[in-house]
């Protein structure tokens, strides 16, 4: 990617745009507009007391619960894993790991195991179904799940044991086709939370932590991206930076598994 393309891609991110200062009057106008949108699209901001109570209860004693889960899950806590998200992300629901082996690549995509904590017969489940998704507005987020849950036990924060669903893929070194696919429940321990800009800096700095891992991830992701284009896939953003390419291609590969 050229320096001009990199600059253009970076300018489109929250990190590249920098902070914006507004007056108190403008802040009030934004709040009023936000409330109008909530009413127009029937978006609920506050959670019912029962949902909040369930969320608090599910975050009690989670470390002991995770230890108990090790008996029934793959223990991947020693596997290097990391998350890459926007600078303003509040929950980290996916992480990746990658390794080059003699006979190809091995890629892991880890997804936070939300369903372990949110069951179909719970008030949290009913509320999540009603909301449908998390709504992101400028400087404001309306969560699908209570932040007590979404930003703690359901978030793959660094240096904490977390429950996950893992897609482990062995890829052919030439065609990048699947040699093996294994999907299982796991316990992981993310090594670091990166922003997209931090990922770019790690790629540029050979001495930075996770440089080798991110470089390998981009090498693989770039090849998968080019392969998709050759296969006729629609590419909406050809100037996407390396960090976004890594996450996008790894998630697409996991979705195909």
Name every feature range the model reports, one short phrase each.
Residues 2-40, 50-257:
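Electropositive polyanion-binding surfaces
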């Amino acid at each position: 990617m050229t320096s001009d393309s990199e600059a253009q891609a970076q300018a489109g991110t929250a990190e590249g745009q920098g902070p914006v200062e507004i007056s108190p009057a403008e802040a009030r106008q934004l709040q009023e507009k936000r409330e109008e949108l909530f009413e127009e699209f029937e978006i609920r901001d506050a959670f019912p007391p029962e949902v909040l109570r369930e969320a608090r209860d599910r975050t009690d004693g989670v470390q002991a619960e995770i230890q108990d889960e090790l008996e029934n899950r793959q223990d991947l806590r020693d596997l290097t894993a990391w998350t890459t998200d926007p600078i303003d992300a509040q929950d980290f629901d996916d992480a990746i790991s990658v390794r080059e082996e003699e006979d190809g690549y091995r890629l892991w995509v880890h997804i936070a195991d939300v369903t372990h904590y949110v069951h179909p017969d719970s008030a949290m489940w009913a509320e999540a179904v009603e909301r449908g998704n998390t709504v992101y507005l400028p400087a404001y987020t309306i969560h699908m799940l209570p932040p007590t849950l979404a930003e703690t036990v359901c978030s793959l924060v660094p240096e904490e044991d977390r429950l996950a669903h893992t897609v482990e893929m062995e890829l052919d070194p030439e065609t990048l086709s699947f040699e093996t696919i294994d999907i299982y429940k796991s316990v992981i321990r993310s090594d670091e939370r990166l922003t997209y800009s931090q990922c770019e800096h790690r790629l540029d700095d050979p001495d930075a932590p996770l440089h080798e891992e991110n470089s390998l991830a981009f090498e693989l992701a770039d090849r998968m991206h080019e392969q998709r284009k050759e296969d006729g896939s629609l590419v909406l953003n050809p100037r996407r930076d390396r960090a976004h390419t890594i996450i996008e291609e790894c998630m697409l590969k996991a979705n195909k598994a």
